[in-house]
Amino acid sequence: MKTGLEIIAAERQRQIEQEGWTPEHDAEHVNDEMAIAASAYALPDYCRHIVKHYDGYPKEVSYPRGWPWDAKWWKPCPGNRIKELAKAGALIAAEIDRLMNAEMKAHGIDTEKIKTDKESE
């Protein structure tokens, strides 16, 4: 059985490989979007304030209040709290990485060189 940390790491890897949410892409989200999205997935369903609207289409779209992106990116997993918490954890990990990379760049540290050095080990 996998640990929570392993499940979160696997979800983060899936986000990068299948969704294309790379560190370079994440660097564009400078307004806490990933942390906000993580908090939405971390809340149990009964605590989410769902906004319902028609968004110009006859089909109703639902997503949590404060959701930082287009409604199409809200992908809850009803009945699977582990999967939702894995998404939340992976988004938090991505936000931590983004903040650390931004801090290193602000101090003149080349994050690409660090990544290259790690890959060659």
Name each region found by the language model.
Residues 1-121:
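Intrinsically disordered, low-complexity regulatory regions
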